[in-house]
């Protein structure tokens, strides 16, 4: 059954006015995001509460998606409704801010599981955070890049930190994924619309599987 969900550095800047108009025009094309797939809700809901509470998921909005057309906040809300109460959404962030948040979480509980989910250009903030954490021997458990082209040049020019256990690269069907990310797997979503990827049913399905894996 499908469920409707609520809807620096190469370096990041706010989009010019024409880009904002383009985002508005593409809102309809992005469509209505639904959650579906083969992982039953019971796979999440039967996990012990303490296992889900140990997982902290930070969803980071694209700096270009100022209108939140990608609906990543709705994805975070969906996972909170499924018991992953420590799912947070950042409208804006930075590498140092994310690194500081990871350190704070580790300080509170060194057994916590941390996932960073970056929509499009937010991948550069995750890269920056990992680089900073790597300098002090710190790491995260999972990173997810959602259809990011921004990260491709960064990785081609500077490589990618490896201080994480697993990377999931979720890309639309006509967009080649970034290459050179260690410990990574590629997941495709059957859309050619960049703005639809973050809340696409296949994306949410993959995130469900990854969070269950992380909590177990």
Each language-model region and where it sits:
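Bacterial N-terminal signal peptides that target proteins for export
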Residues: 3-21
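Bacterial N-terminal signal peptides
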Residues: 19-29
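Active-site catalytic motif of lipid deacylating hydrolases and related acyltransferases
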Residues: 35-112
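Lipolytic serine-hydrolase domain surface
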Residues: 64, 73, 155-216
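Solvent-exposed, acidic/flexible segments
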Residues: 64-72, 91, 95, 119-126, ...
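Serine-dependent carboxylesterase/thioesterase catalytic core
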Residues: 79, 86, 99-181
